[in-house]
Amino acid sequence: MEKVKIEEIQSTAKKQRIATHTHIKGLGLEPTGIPIKLAAGFVGQLEAREAAGLVVDMIKQKKMAGKALLLAGPPGTGKTALALGISQELGSKVPFCPMVGSEVYSSEVKKTEVLMENFRRAIGLRIKETKEVYEGEVTELSPEETESLTGGYGKSISHVVITLKTVKGTKHLKLDPTIYDALIKEKVAVGDVIYIEANSGAVKRVGRSDAFATEFDLEAEEYVPLPKGEVHKKKEIVQDVTLQDLDAANARPQGGQDILSLMGQMMKPRKTEITDKLRQEINKVVNRYIDEGVAELVPGVLFIDEVHMLDMECFSYLNRALESSLSPIVIFATNRGVCNVRGTDMPSPHGVPIDLLDRLVIIRTQIYDPSEMIQIIAIRAQVEELTVDEECLVLLGEIGQRTSLRHAVQLLSPASIVAKMNGRDNICKADIEEVTSLYLDAKSSAKLLHEQQEKYIS
């Protein structure tokens, strides 16, 4: 009997690059808020995750706006992962703006301006708008022409007659000639499902009606069902924007059509500051929208990693910004112990001034034990689609304890290439030993430098 050929279809979707925290999918908590030992890509750090879970609940209930949080712990203990877990738990509707302390230093823009931009990027505004729309399948589309007013043989379109059909009924519409241009731009034809906004005259082609799904067409069409309800309906449209989007839109109005404006648009614009006056005007409009019930403020999260990189000016600015009416939840992270505040001789815990530390609640992250390190390395191997045996994981756990977790995880990719060169799919102990002899960790390199100090230029 002839063998039936069955082929698997490979997905054409783009594969995302595997980053350091790709495996983090949330905080891994039960509905009661109790952390699960191994869940959502997280291993251990039970107290820190439980504390972060309470923060997420407070953010969702809008009880934590203007408050700040500090994630403190040694390097490689999951501070950034914890912040990312918080953002995953909050979902895509709550703005999450990550930045690094060193980002504030720019030759063009003041430090405080960079901080303010990120503050406003972390505050969302949900605008609800009721729009009148005509929606349905196009059954007739005929432009009506008249003699051109300028004379000659040319003709101009006076109006467009269009018939839209839904499940409930049909409507004949007489549209303005400007809408005809929008119909041509969207390539609307009979059998397409479209919707037209009554106020602006904007036309959106949703797709082809599924009644035509049996047609053979070279171009891949998106087939959509016939719209339900009446042709003329009111739709509530919700838009999510950030305050920084509003600032940027109003700070750079579109230029005219003259040659100077066009040249100015083509040239690379220099990054300029948005004035306080403009921000205050936008705040007034936002407050009016909130009072009218048109918009709703969504305080998001601003995550500042390596907070010890900020100086006294930034910290004094943060003190004031945290107490303003429009302030997001700010999460700081640092791996410093007692050190000088940048630009001063004043020692302070975590490199943060005492007056700002008073305003923070601090979450500690603990160093991972060997069994937790082995579990993390196993999760990373799974994410990177690598096969690692048990003996190899134990060795990587020992390397992680001796050097750092990051170094142990970084050895996985080169070890997989060594395994493939040796004709194996799975990584074994010999591959890890070979890679370890090739690549030094920070402690080994420092020890070597100390031993061969006289051979280096100091």
Swiss-Prot record:
Q: Which GO terms describe its biological process?
A: cell differentiation; flower development; meristem development; regulation of defense response to fungus
UniProt entry keywords in alphabetical sequence: ATP-binding, Developmental protein, Differentiation, Flowering, Helicase, Hydrolase, Nucleotide-binding, Nucleus
The yes or no answer to whether the keyword Nucleotide-binding is present is yes
UniProt catalytic activity: ATP + H2O = ADP + phosphate + H(+)
Q: What is this protein called?
A: RuvB-like protein 1
Q: Tell me which family the UniProt entry assigns to this protein.
A: Belongs to the RuvB family.
Subunit info here reads:
Interacts with FRI, and with FLX and FES1, two component of the transcription activator complex FRI-C. Interacts with the disease resistance genes RPM1 and RPP5.
Task: Quote the function comment for this protein.
Answer: Proposed core component of the chromatin remodeling INO80 complex which is involved in transcriptional regulation, DNA replication and probably DNA repair. Component of the NuA4 histone acetyltransferase complex which is involved in transcriptional activation of select genes principally by acetylation of nucleosomal histones H4 and H2A. Has single-stranded DNA-stimulated ATPase and ATP-dependent DNA helicase (3' to 5') activity suggesting a role in nuclear processes such as recombination and transcription.
Compartments where found: Nucleus
The domain of life for this entry's organism is Eukaryota
Principal location = nucleus
EC number(s) stated in the UniProt entry for this protein: 3.6.4.12
The record's annotation in Pfam families points to: TIP49, TIP49_C
EC primary class: hydrolase
The consequence of inactivating this gene is:
Gametophyte lethality.
Positions contributing to ATP binding:
73-80
Concerning Gene3D superfamilies, the annotation shows: 1.10.8.60, P-loop containing nucleotide triphosphate hydrolases, RuvB-like helicase, domain II
**SMART domains to which the protein is assigned, alphabetical:** AAA
Give the UniProt entry's GO cellular component terms: nucleolus; nucleus; Swr1 complex
A molecular function annotated in GO for this UniProt entry is: ATP-dependent activity, acting on DNA
